[in-house]
């Protein structure tokens, strides 16, 4: 009986130690980058006085460019935005890089490892879209300053909440932006009694 108790304690200790390592393993897996398509992460200034930093995954073809650019905007997972993992849209990015495009996937303020704050305007979907579009504007401004980007050939795309933000972005003057792509744009918000189905 004494030996069985020691074995259970050892097993429990090993199990708890393994659980403690899991977040580190998840972060390590998340940070694995595909250098074959020059994947890297940058921080783009955004927000009031450019105090926030947008964690942005970049993919680009080999060579100095300039390359046409597609900016792909993410949706929102249920729960707190800072718990959402970094989006990569890897397969889409890979397809565009193979066709000579650079790709940026910015995580907007408050999402994943981006700093700043996520602003929730409740049921006012117009305000939600415009607020999220501000971070896309910051990404565009940063991109236009890069010598490896063709600032006259930019496409902005978005999926779900990123699609809503992309459509909101379209109300502004966007020099060099040739297309806006919306993939099932919108925001489902059950928490505020928004009645999103109506």
List the model feature ranges, each with a label.
Residues 77-89, 95, 105-131:
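Cap/lid segment of the alpha/beta-hydrolase catalytic domain
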Residues 66-75:
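Short beta-strand element of the alpha/beta-hydrolase
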């Amino acid at each position: 009986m004494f030996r069985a108790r020691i074995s259970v304690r050892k097993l429990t200790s090993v199990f708890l130690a393994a659980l403690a390592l899991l977040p580190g393993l998840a972060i390590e897996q998340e940070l694995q980058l595909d250098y074959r398509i020059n994947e890297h992460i940058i921080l783009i200034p955004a927000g009031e006085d450019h105090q926030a930093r947008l964690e942005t995954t970049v993919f680009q073809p080999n060579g100095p460019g300039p390359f046409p650019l597609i900016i792909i905007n993410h949706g929102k997972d249920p729960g707190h935005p800072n718990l959402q993992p970094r989006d990569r849209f890897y397969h889409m990015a890979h397809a565009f890089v193979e066709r000579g495009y650079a790709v940026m996937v910015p995580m907007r303020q408050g999402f994943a490892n981006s700093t700043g704050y996520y602003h929730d305007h409740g049921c006012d979907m117009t305000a939600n879209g415009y607020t999220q579009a501000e971070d896309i504007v910051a990404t565009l401004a940063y991109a236009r300053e890069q010598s490896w980007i063709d600032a006259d050939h930019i496409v902005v795309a978005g999926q779900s909440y990123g699609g809503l933000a992309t459509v909101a972005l379209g109300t502004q003057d966007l020099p060099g932006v040739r297309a806006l792509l919306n993939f099932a744009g919108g925001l489902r918000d059950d928490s505020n009694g928004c009645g999103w189905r109506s």
